[in-house]
Amino acid sequence: MKTNKLVLIRHGQSKWNKLNKFTGWHDIELSDNGINEALKAGSLLKKEKFFFDYAHTSMLKRAIHTLRYILDTLDQSWLPVQKSWRLNERHYGALEGLNKDEMISKYGEEQVNLWRRSFEIIPPQIRLNDKRFPGNDIRYSNIDNNELPLGESLELTAKRVIPYWNKFILPQIKKRNRVLIVAHGNSLRALIQFLNKIDNKKILELNIPTATPIILEFNEEYNSIKWYYL
């Protein structure tokens, strides 16, 4: 029986997660542990008899591959999958590719935590000629450079995630379709904050673990009434 539930999953551990680097829009592979995490997430969903009508993911392979492993485990590899840059991880600007502990040593733990977790604070931004600018990547060639980030706060991340939710995912939910989203820590934080009306200061405390299914339940007005880890 179809229910008003949405499943969110952050990708499995990536090779840069393992090295404690700011990853952002860098297209990094899953680690061996990340692959195992994705398979376990799929097995858990299968055990709980989850079945989906649609899936959404980002343009980054750590999320795409996590979704692939999950759907393989569910024997749902045929499922329609929509990929969008709007579900990409938050762009960490000039921090991308750098080690988090080294940045803490340089700037202090409080400042780095604000860059990582706060709602409105933007990390140091890159320039358009920086190789880390998404406009230099062929996969974003059909997107206006003015829309692509030089570095984002959670607030800026939410400004691209929420329109995608309203245009593509919410209409599917309203038709009582069962939807799976596999994305990233901050794009999912932005969505969870929006759907559950979490205070901007409280969102600082939310850290989403890798490859752990999150269930959101909606009422008949399609408002989120609760969320929890499976």
Swiss-Prot record:
Top-level taxon: Bacteria
Binding site for substrate: 10-17, 23-24, 62, 89-92, 100, 116-117, 185-186
Record site: Transition state stabilizer: 184
One BP term from GO: glycolytic process
UniProt entry keywords in alphabetical sequence: Gluconeogenesis, Glycolysis, Isomerase
InterPro entries the record matches: His_Pase_superF_clade-1, His_PPase_superfam, PG/BPGM_mutase_AS, Phosphogly_mut1
Active site: 11 (tele-phosphohistidine intermediate), 89 (proton donor/acceptor)
Enzyme Commission number: 5.4.2.11
Pfam families attached to this UniProt entry: His_Phos_1
Reaction catalysis annotation: (2R)-2-phosphoglycerate = (2R)-3-phosphoglycerate
MF-aspect GO terms: phosphoglycerate mutase activity
Main enzyme class: isomerase
Entry annotated with the keyword Isomerase: yes
Pathway(s) this gene product operates in, as recorded in its UniProt entry: Carbohydrate degradation; glycolysis; pyruvate from D-glyceraldehyde 3-phosphate: step 3/5
Subunit structure, as described in the record: Homodimer.
Recorded family membership: Belongs to the phosphoglycerate mutase family. BPG-dependent PGAM subfamily.
Biological role stated in the UniProt entry: Catalyzes the interconversion of 2-phosphoglycerate and 3-phosphoglycerate.
Protein name: 2,3-bisphosphoglycerate-dependent phosphoglycerate mutase
